[in-house]
Amino acid sequence: MEVENRPYPYMVSDANLLQQIKESSAEGLFKSFSLLLGKDVRESGVKFEALLGVYTNATQFVKFLETSLAVSCVNTEFKDLKRMTDGKIQFKINVPTIAHGDGRRPQKQKQFIIMKATNKHHIGAEIELSTQDLELLFLSKETPLDVTEYVGAVKTITSALQFGIDALERGLIDTVLTVKLRHAPPLFILKTLADPTYTERGLKKNVKSDLISMFKTHLVNNSFFLDKSEHLPHSRQYVLGILTEMIGAVCKETVFKGISTYSTANGQPISGVLETTDKVMRKLVNVIGQADNSIMGPAAYANYVVRGENLVTAISYGKAMRNFDHFMSKLVDNPTSNLDNDAVDTFESTGSIQKTPISTSVVMVGNKLIALESLQRMYNETQLPYPLNRRMHYTYYFPVGLHLPSPKYSTSMSVKGTENVLHQSVEAWIVNKNNTLQCFNYQNALKSICHPRMNSPILCARALGEAFPDVHNLNIYGIRSEDAHTMNLYQIVYDYYDNKHVAHVHSLAQKSMMTHEEVLHPTNHEILRTEVHPFFDVYAERHQGAAVQYRATHRNLSGNLPPPLAPYSFQECRGYQFEVASGLNHVIDSTTMEIIQETAFDPAYPLLCYIVESMIHGQEEKFVMNIPLIALCIQTYWNNSGRLAFINSFYMLKFICTHMGNGHISKDAYSCYRKIYGELIAIEQSLYRLAGHENVANENIGQLINAILDKDLLPPFAYNDIFTNLLRKSSRHPVVKIGMEEYDDDNDQQNCINIREKMEDLVGNMVNIYQQRNNTDHSRRYVLDVGELQENTYNSVLEKIFYYVLLPVCTNGHVCGMGVDFENVALTLTYNGPVFASAVNQDADILDHLENGTLRDVLVASEIRPTVGMIRRLCTSFLTCPFITQAARIKTDRDPGQNIVTHTDGKYVHQTVLVNGFAAFAIADKSRDAAHCLFYPVPFNKLYCDPMVAATLHPIVAEFITEIPSQRNAVVFNLPPRLIAEYEEWHKSPMSSYVSTCSQTPLSLSTMIAMHLKLSPVSFICQSRHKIHPGFALTAVRTDEVVAEHIMYSSKASTSVFIGQPTVHRKEVRSDAVVFDINHELASLDTALGYSSTIVPAHAAAITTDMGIHCQDLFAMFPSEAYSNQQLNEYIKQKIGSDRVYGMPLRDPREYMGGNRRVTLPGLSHGQLATCEVIMTPVTADITYFQSSNSPRGRASCVVSCDAYNNESAEKFLYDHSLPDPCYEFRSTINPWASQIGSLGDVFFNSQHRQMAGPTLYSPCKQFFNKEAILKNNKLFYTLVTEYVNRLTGAPATSNTDFQYVVINGTDVFLEQPCQFLQEAYPTLSASHRALLDEYMSHKTTHAPVHVNQYLVEEVAPMKRLLKVGNKTVY
């Protein structure tokens, strides 16, 4: 049949199937070409455009009526829509009341006046028709070939027309869907705000707080419900429950009442429509079943096609309306009228409009029939994103290296083999998106924690100065040492403690004496204020006439971390790790260490031992001379008490082991000395094994790893010229301050150092020595008297291990520096008749010949009976003894990894070396009178300043600690500033605090060695390689992206769509074609009395990031920043894998731009790398904090309960640590290094410091630290909650009320980036030990969140993953 013989569309009287409209309209259009235009289509373009407009009117909304989306819409013709600029419709709603019979006053009638605003939309399409094809339509068809060409032209033009018309049809659907989404808040918002428990209480602070809590709960519980249902025993009931909540959360009241547009075949109304994706639709049908496969929709559209001029159909509750005026008269002015009775007026003598079946899925939810539809295919065909597919961003966090406090316990009955309480975790096991177990450890984080910016206090100090310019009660004690104008140590000590009635306790000591709970309590916020950086001690000072300035000095050693943030049990775990990593096998045992402790606390320790030690003063020749006396002292004391004499001196220990192994003393005693010395050697070898053999920056790498191996740290006691040796070998510009003189050049040795040679070489110089001893003012003689250093046998490492590790640990710090009055000692020994009386036999017991005096009292108290010859030889040793005990103040540059400072003095580290002094134990009461004449206390080092020992050496110290009893603790004991200033020292209060409480076990020695590991990048590299904890934990933060498939519910007839007249005009006329633009004006009006739609994530289609362990490379982000030593900088970058790109010039501009200089990986295995950033965190951070959603800052950031426009109040909420954390009222924070103003985390991620420290690349942490963004989000959140509550609480409205039930600004961010909005990250599945994760993956009903010192954190997030390892799955 020829095409022209088909019936014309405008002669058709009726059509029941919607699809027939397109076919009939298209066929009739071609006949109209010849009737109206003739052969040349370009001659009558206006008529053709009008005809094309008629065609588009006739076919535009057919496909829309076939969709289930139309269930929720009402369509109305509005020819003058293009003239409308601001369309509004006002509705009056009467509020019903309840009449009470208890005498209450009747309520007045209330009326809501709701103003509904329309929103205009524009859709357009382009149609291109070939001129040649149009001309073929009018050629005579004389041959079969002509007919074939004619049919081909018809098909071509039909295809072009179909393309344009389909675009308009899809445009309408897309517009309506977009309008619906604009009126569809997330379910977790509507569900919360619809709860009368909250809405009836008013919008107070406590109510807002409750609302936020419920937002969080519903967000986690309701999101991705289809995924969660797959692993629930009653999945169908769970899914139906969520769908029921969606239906119940929306408003079912509209301005139209009573009649349903769409229904089932048996007449049951369709209550609404669920729009979703193909996959979600299939899953829903599979889970809850399908109640029907079609619905009955209006078919009246065809009737209007044949009526000529009225080509736009307005469908409202199954009826067609002529125009907008008719809409106003019937639905607005008289909305309760029965439209069925008005059918004659409406349709001009036409009865009820006909309906046609439309194929769609219908599900039964409760007692309601809901249409279920997916429009995804339409978007897939057009290669456009589907609005119900959204990208969600969730930020996860997990801890690395936390230490669980005692008592240890376990919640597992199956995990075995990890019961060792000393096993400290240095890693976190996580599961990535492909269920691959991955280990995040400190080696992953080296690219961040080794960067210069992480090791800099400059920004912290600057931010503190800006935030706290006024500081009351400034502390000056311990900040800076004073120059000693005298070499007389006795005078220095006496002047300091004489008439001293006030004790100062700086924050270092205060923190060392506090518990973890105390230091984080809001009442201690002033102490906590300066705890802003794990590597630095910060203090405030004010110079005369200047403002307050904040300074920072490096903590040097991991043992100097405050005990509340790095407790002793944790340090012992590090000691155990050191043993394992270095292969240390202790030679010493607990019994020997207890003997040393008993010796230190022995009130009967022989005073004669100190006299002998002072006469020998570290000189081997004098030791050899006096071996018989020394052996007598050792053996007598061992026999009397079972304790060890001379154990307070390294040189005495060394000489005893060297020269007294041939029977001078008992085998048992000698064995103890050998064990002690053997322990020193074992520790030394373990240190070298740990450090390795590399050289960095012209230094052995061990110097940058452990302070014991650092040649710039000298032993605390010196008897030989170790100072010149330091000047010759150190590259850190050491300066030896000798009183008022500075010795910084080894060429000045003769002016600053007096080398006392061996006695046999000084026979001819004895007179000069005697004259110098008696005629010189030694208080003003700035020269050190020391022996010659034997460099080939000198081993400072063994000496430092003894003085800084073994002796403090074994004595519990019950030891103090002691000065000697050599003149009085000599008088005590020599001014006795038997000593040099030739009549007395040298083998005679001297006590048999001594008269009453100091020496007799000393010998009697010591219970030692030397011979006359022994005392004579001891007196001979005095001939070349030093004149006085002296002190030298050593200043050196810090190592190149620790020299980023806030002020010039901070570049230096200081220590005091006691020259020809000794370490003393407490003096017994019976010996004190004699001791006070011979010795005096010199508290010069935090490990050698026990006030109880010092009090036994001089009554002035005893008076001081008696008057101020708190000063009896070595941690807080005030020390002379001419000898020590704690902020400048190598050893600080935390190490003193540890030794005072540690047990006498070999582990304590390992712990003290581990505490000497440096807080420096090279040390971190070494420790991470050997799995030794660096002293601080990490909070790893990662943002992952999820493609989520949503489901939207919309109630019936909740949106009115106004359709204007289409406009067709020629866009372009060419010789080969004519291009037409078809534009259509649309407007939408929400007709519901509340929110009629809601949306919820139903299924996670894909996780686009790997959820892995890739850590941020700060060397790539800030390539221009480097350590001052270039060799060190290159070494660090090479070791951590952040080298410069090969072949790129050092000064290439790309080096300073950050983003383009890195070489990307050749390929990816698990998808886009999700970058982890690390926040330094105290190891004592509460593990329960990480088991729920919280701010990675360590303190709550969401301040929506505050006044939205009171920034001061909001900032106090964020940063004022005198206020408790609103989420955890018993503390201010869990991480002072990140939550406080000026803390490392704050200055690093806060955009306020962007010009100096804000990462220029992607930073998942920035959203939690950027103050401006936080306050902005909080205001937005406040507004969001307020706006939603105003719309849903039913507050009376006025004629000025213009509440539009639309999605409030920020809702999309809330839904898609909830972590940014709520300022919280979600915990991801992680475990400190793989065993706990393996148990968790065993899919048992119980698992072990805590096991001794190990922990597991479960994943609590909106998206719940199915985890699978091997054949084991757990959800």
From Swiss-Prot:
Keyword Protein transport tagged: no
Residues spanning the membrane: none
One Gene Ontology CC term in the entry: host cell nucleus
An MF annotation (GO) of this entry: structural molecule activity
Pfam families cross-referenced by the UniProt entry: Herpes_MCP
Keywords, sorted A to Z: Capsid protein, Host nucleus, T=16 icosahedral capsid protein, Virion
Compartment list: Virion; Host nucleus
Source organism, top-level taxon: Viruses
HAMAP family: HSV_MCP
Family statement: Belongs to the herpesviridae major capsid protein family.
Function, as annotated: Self-assembles to form an icosahedral capsid with a T=16 symmetry, about 200 nm in diameter, and consisting of 150 hexons and 12 pentons (total of 162 capsomers). Hexons form the edges and faces of the capsid and are each composed of six MCP molecules. In contrast, one penton is found at each of the 12 vertices. Eleven of the pentons are MCP pentamers, while the last vertex is occupied by the portal complex.
Subunit structure: Homomultimer. Makes the hexons and eleven out of twelve pentons. Interacts with triplex proteins 1/TRX1 and 2/TRX2; adjacent capsomers are linked together in groups of three by triplexes, heterotrimeric complexes composed of one molecule of TRX1 and two molecules of TRX2. Interacts with scaffold protein; this interaction allows efficient MCP transport to the host nucleus. Interacts with capsid vertex component 2/CVC2. Interacts with the small capsomere-interacting protein/SCP.
Protein name: Major capsid protein
